[in-house]
Amino acid sequence: MLDPKLVIIKVDGGIVSQLYFFAAGKLFEKKGYRVKYDITWFEQEGRGFYSVDKGYNQVYNVNWDIPKIFPNLHIEIASKLEINRYKKFATDSELFLECKPPLYIVGYNYSVNLNIVEICREIRNFFTPLDLLTNDKIKFLGEEIKRNKSCGVHIRRGDLSKEHVAYGKPTDIDYFLRCINIVMLMHKNIKLYFFSDDNKWVKENIVPCIKGIDCVVSDISTPEQGYLDLYFLSLCKIIIGSHGSMGFGAKLLSQEETLFITPKYNSMLFSMHNIMMINFEPKSN
């Protein structure tokens, strides 16, 4: 029998995409509906998603990581039987929040008109990765970032190191150096923390250009643990984003006073404080 108040949301993608889907679910819960998540994508397409032919040094999975970063929030997973029953109520409408259950939400059209700034403000106090309980190295780095004048720099490479149909051209070296220069002009004694899925590239192309600046290239996480980069970035006083979405996700879960520097337009930026957009044009090869 169908639950007339149940909404099922099909989730896919990396940790920031998952955050979008999860936040959408929270908005439905505010309407008094029950929400479950279809995570079958991770069991199928997510296995080996990050591969050598996509620019990674080895094969990595994309996992369902929301429960790992919000362990104290209630999350329900849809059964395969429920998924099959609700698929006939599927929608990919941009106006999905106006739809009423029974409902099965698929795709990314929902994000066109979705503003999750407020809901992220509500859940960010619950953003405590389980790894903090079991890994002292992670805990200590987080405490160091909170203690220092920290600037987190996210450098997305891997599958986005070449021009991408959805993300466009990759942010180039000049963009990151310009942003770092701006930060250094604004604040003295800043410490840079680099988070990337290609540390070798960062060490060869960025670090040699910023001699004399205190910096750390984090090696705590792998591409399979992007949620840790999201956590560390959210703790930084300043976040420098790339053409990927990690920096924006970190800003959503950070404190209001955190400065976010980005090359990427997003309508939600107008609902936030302390935003700096840097216009840039990647150099042609």
Predicted regions and their residues:
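Extreme N-terminal starter segment of soluble prokaryotic enzymes
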Residues: 2-8
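Secretory-pathway luminal glycosyltransferase catalytic domains
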Residues: 5, 46-187, 285
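A short acidic (Asp/Glu
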Residues: 20, 46-50, 164, 202-206, ...
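A structural signal for isolated positions on well-ordered beta-strands in alpha/beta enzyme cores
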Residues: 8, 36, 152, 191-193
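Short amphipathic alpha-helix
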Residues: 20-28
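Donor-binding and catalytic core of enzymes assembling or modifying cell-surface/extracellular glycoconjugates
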Residues: 15, 185-278
